[in-house]
């Protein structure tokens, strides 16, 4: 009995001590939680980093067919992949303009096809299920995704659903949740920015939950990417701008990650950043500039290679959360969020951003901090010259908790971010996004 009484006293004393400590510092538990989060995130990054060489060897990037009129080679690409009837996945505009001559070329080469041309921006779970149903009803054996990131992501997700008929989209969200071979995918980008033609990612919106699912699995990497600049000349200026900044975000976020970088990913990111700084404004001002259009396609591809290896960061995590709630165009969200997050990262990313400032010619002298800040300022200037906003005034305070929850779950749970955020820091960034509108 005495031992029990003594134990109770000790327990009470311990509780009291914790209470006193908490009273002395109300952030006691928050600090402990933050430290645990940092440890878990960094440990997970290091574990994943060890598996990357094996993943790279098992799942090489897509083969590339590039240059003006390269889309004419799609039939021979499909024949090489033994695709006899292909599911063409696209959106309404591209379906009316770019797809018909490609479909006619397939007919001439004896390749059957069926077309789903209702993919929306931020493709939904409902759209993915419709594509899957049409694919199965028509006995298809491959996917041909033509358009921006939305058709490519929808095709990837549909391929995953065909391969795993009993697993809903939500259960495949996260890293390596598909883990099974899917039907061959050929990606034909008509925008220059998403990088989906080379990556293992697909982002799908659940409108009922107002949430975006990021599915990342190496089995979803397309077998071929067809980079034909002639297919991008009809892009409106706004789409040129936002998809171009999307590609820049991929390259920059890849470059500043805490882990996973290697010489190849860094080289791809650097090449992408330089090409974008040299060619995005040209493509924006003259959509028929084929040289600039092709350079932007290559930049998007290179950026995709980079972040397919390293992942991205909080810019994308916040953009995905906002897209789920407000249906914000992904590239536009990245354009607004990127400079704010890069500034918030502070000294953790100054060396990398300083080097990007040097190779782009933005600033070649001064301290790392000065060069990094000049690089961020150059991004803001580029946005301004293309008519993109500096912030968003439509974000409501009542949605902050949900955005914070989703962004932290994605950022801390998936990406090797250079700085690990807690709720307070994420809220600070969201406030800046609103205040700078």
Regions picked out by a protein language model, each given a short descriptive name:
Residues 201-310:
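Carboxylate- and glycine-rich phosphate/diphosphate-binding segment that chelates Mg2+/Mn2+
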Residues 71-74, 95-99, 125-128, 150-155, ...:
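Short glycine/serine/threonine-rich phosphate/pyrophosphate-binding segments
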Residues 32-142:
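ATP/NTP phosphate-donor binding region
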Residues 32-43, 47, 353, 363-437:
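C-terminal charged capping/lid subdomain of soluble metabolic enzymes
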Residues 126-230:
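Glycine/threonine-rich beta-strand-loop-alpha-helix active-site module
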Residues 310-374, 380:
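C-terminal catalytic subdomain
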Residues 3-26:
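Hydrophobic alpha-helical topogenic segments used for membrane insertion/localization
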